[in-house]
Amino acid sequence: MQWRLDKRHVSEEEQVKDNGLTLDFDEVARKGALGGGEKLLSKWYGIYGSRHPGAHMARVVIPGGVVTSSQARRIVQVAEDYGQGKISITTRQCVQFHWLKAPALADMLRDLAKDNLSCFHGCGDVARNVVACPLAETCQYKRVNVLPYAKETAKELTAMRDLDNLPRKFKINFSGCGAGCGQPFINCIGAIAVTRKNEAGDDEVGFRVVIGGGMGWEAFIGKELFS
């Protein structure tokens, strides 16, 4: 919970967030380390701390899990320059760098931006990376290619500053057919492409929407909201 049961008191985390979510990584580089409040705010920029003193993790947001060849080369270059030449690929289609040093975070983020890559909203109480089926564009069973839907949804949500500070993280998934390869039933919102015949007998494409799924301390399978 973000709030204590006594509503007159707000958690220290909420107090930090109420003071604004802006973080200057160039200032962090000048200081050589993240301060207490900065460690919390860095999550909104896709940066986590580590059990190892002085080491950080950065999560690159990749809507739909698809990168260009230029972006792939950029990811490799950033890993080699800042992250010991290693990356992790997450179950929600992000890329993570580890063993990052605080003074280098600003330069790392700038290098990613050269190929339109970002860690923004990679962590924290925000709408996280929007996921799509791994083979959204090519699967023979797809009702529709859901990759453009995932990318456009991510673009719209990332631009909404009033969604920067949600009560908890929020996860969205698009799946191209009922097989649900994008794991729609374990996300906050899962949109599963379906088809039906309209009055003229033509196929219409829409979505079956399930909500409330998750794999936290208490796992829940999403329930259908509408189709």
Kindly give the residue locations of the regions a language model identified:
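Small-residue-enriched alpha-helical segments and adjacent helix-cap loops
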Residues: 26-34, 50, 55-204
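Charge-rich, low-complexity segments
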Residues: 1-45, 184
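Short glycine-enriched loops at secondary-structure junctions
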Residues: 125, 213-215
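Internal alpha/beta scaffold segment
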Residues: 215-227
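Intrinsically disordered, low-complexity regions
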Residues: 2, 22, 114, 163, ...
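FAD-binding subdomain of flavoenzyme oxidoreductases
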Residues: 183-184, 207-213
